[in-house]
């Protein structure tokens, strides 16, 4: 194979404006050596996806069938082509995947012919027994280099590994995988637990350099010509127009040749310490096409280029027939049920942004859902975590068969809501619960909720109270005031109140570890409660109103 000729790589670093919207800014260039003729050079192509979240249908994205066909076309240009994911393939998914135990997504990934994936935090949305099922059905290799044990992920036939190698056309590429160390806080407690030889264990996920560097040494010892790190971490802020965050830290410190990120759902590519670092946004809206020139005699990467591929510049616009049939078969199982209209809303509530709106301040859907559950259970207050809001409402990623429904914000409302929208915005199957809390615990809960601003999903959407947070202050000291609806201050003391929240939050998810779980009263599935409220409004001839009303004040 001839040497790969590469143009200088122009890469994009995203900055964040005051509204949390990213835009291209300064670039950095990695230049390929002009001429190397004596070494055995090989051209390697990598196709990378991340945070797919079971987006099997082509709603403002590729969809599984079109991704499959494009990946197939891409591979025709290079015999040394590898297809990889940086995690969150499943979990927080539309109903077509979530209502079918996520199996359709694994089947779709098999159809797309993935080689390797790391676990993301959402792979652990359900327990390890479920994840073992996903591994069992996977025709690709899962890797996890920063887990203390992989015994809980051994199916007997397929199993996760700390590293893997894949060889094609005389090039052996090594892969390691790093999941975010914050996973335990972002999932239901107990989802990392397993039994082995009659004893109870729990997977520990860390950013341990010892574990990760051991995997890098091992994959090199296994003969890898180049090493790719699949990392389920992203970037979360910028300083002077340059992205910062865990992904960037890893890229600067790891002794690897290529780094792919994920988790923060933001397009990014740059060069750090000579290492190309790239990630794409979520839900199959785009993928990375990376070309690498590697010297297989010296195991040296001589140059690399990266291009983000969207539906507008993709090589194929024809869907893969087999994957399309599989997706349609699963869709037909649930379509009639999920397309039932349950209400109308006055606005399309937003999601996302470089600083996701649902994770960084007051949100209209968050306000409404907190109000609904507080009223239903008659509690003093309610708290809904922003990370549980997974889509716009109506959901842009769910497409009913009835095209006469008003769905898009470019149309004039009110906007029609079907069951599929509710299961898309709340896909986890959490259970609303009631608990008794003290004023001290309430303050601690809100402090935790604003502690990672503008990152993370723990931002608290509340009902029955108002609060002010000064996010310029140190963590643990950001809540300025909490009042009830009459304006009376909520003191940081032992006075007790009733609070509605999800079982996920009550049991310590997203760092909410201040509650006494023994006092928890489990009630109803989150989606079912919201469906009931929507239907009640529709029966009364009302459009459900969602709005911002100033219950949350953020000092920046």
Predicted segments with their positions:
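Catalytic centers of hydrolytic enzymes
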Residues: 42-45, 54-57, 73-76, 183-203, ...
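Acidic, metal/ion-coordinating pockets
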Residues: 36-316, 360-372, 434, 451-453, ...
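Surface-exposed, short loops/turns at beta-strand junctions within beta-sandwich domains
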Residues: 2-8
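Short coil/turn segments at beta-strand junctions that form active-site/ligand-binding loops
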Residues: 7, 79-81, 225, 379, ...
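Extracellular fibronectin type III
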Residues: 18-35
């Amino acid at each position: 194979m001839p040497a790969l000729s590469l143009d200088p790589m122009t890469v994009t670093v995203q900055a964040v404006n005051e509204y949390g919207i990213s835009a291209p800014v300064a670039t950095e260039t990695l230049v390929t050596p002009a001429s190397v003729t004596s070494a055995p050079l090989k051209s390697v192509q990598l196709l990378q996806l991340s945070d797919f979240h079971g987006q099997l249908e082509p709603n403002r994205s590729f969809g599984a069938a079109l991704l499959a066909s494009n990946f197939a076309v891409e591979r025709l240009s290079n015999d040394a082509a590898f297809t990889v994911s940086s995690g969150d393939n499943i979990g927080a998914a539309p109903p077509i995947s979530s209502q079918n135990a996520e199996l359709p997504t694994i089947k779709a990934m098999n159809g797309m012919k993935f080689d390797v994936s790391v676990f993301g935090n959402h792979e652990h949305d359900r327990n390890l027994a479920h994840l073992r099922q996903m591994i069992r059905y996977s025709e690709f290799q899962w890797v996890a280099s920063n887990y203390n044990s992989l015994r809980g992920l051994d199916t007997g036939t397929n199993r996760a590994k700390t590293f893997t190698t894949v060889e094609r056309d005389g090039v052996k590429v090594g892969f390691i995988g790093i999941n975010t160390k914050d996973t335990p806080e972002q999932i239901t407690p107990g989802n990392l637990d397993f039994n082995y030889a009659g004893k109870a264990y729990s997977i520990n996920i860390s950013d341990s350099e010892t574990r990760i560097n051991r995997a890098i040494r091992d994959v090199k010892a296994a003969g890898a010509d180049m090493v790719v790190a699949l990392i389920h971490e992203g970037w979360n802020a910028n300083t002077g127009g340059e992205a910062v965050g865990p992904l960037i830290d890893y890229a600067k410190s790891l002794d690897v040749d290529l780094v792919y990120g994920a988790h923060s759902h933001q397009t990014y590519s740059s060069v750090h310490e000579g290492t190309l670092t790239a990630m794409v946004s979520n839900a199959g809206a785009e993928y990375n096409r990376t070309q690498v020139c590697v010297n297989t005699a010296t195991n040296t990467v001589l140059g690399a280029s990266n291009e983000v591929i969207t539906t507008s510049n993709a090589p194929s616009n024809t869907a893969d027939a087999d994957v399309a049939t599989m997706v349609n078969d699963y869709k037909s199982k649930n379509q009639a049920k999920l397309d039932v209209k349950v209400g109308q809303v006055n606005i399309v509530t937003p999601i996302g942004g470089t600083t996701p709106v649902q994770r960084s301040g007051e949100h209209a859907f968050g306000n409404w859902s907190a109000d609904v559950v507080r009223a239903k259970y008659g509690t003093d207050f309610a708290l809904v975590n922003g990370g549980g809001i997974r889509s716009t409402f109506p959901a842009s990623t769910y497409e009913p068969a009835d095209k006469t429904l008003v769905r898009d914000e470019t149309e004039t409302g009110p906007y029609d809501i079907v069951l599929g929208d509710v299961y898309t915005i709340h896909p986890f199957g959490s259970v609303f619960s009631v608990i008794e809390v003290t004023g001290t615990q309430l303050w601690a809960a809100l402090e935790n909720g604003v502690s990672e601003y503008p990152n993370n999903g723990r931002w608290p959407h509340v009902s029955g109270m108002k609060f002010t947070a000064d996010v310029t202050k140190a963590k643990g000291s950001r809540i300025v005031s909490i009042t009830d609806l009459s304006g009376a201050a909520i003191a940081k003391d032992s006075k007790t109140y009733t609070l509605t929240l999800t079982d996920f939050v009550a049991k310590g998810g997203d760092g909410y570890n201040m509650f006494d779980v023994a006092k928890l009263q489990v009630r109803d599935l989150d989606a079912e409660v919201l469906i009931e409220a929507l239907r009640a409004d529709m029966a009364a001839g009302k459009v459900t109103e969602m709005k911002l009303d100033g219950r949350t004040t953020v000092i920046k």
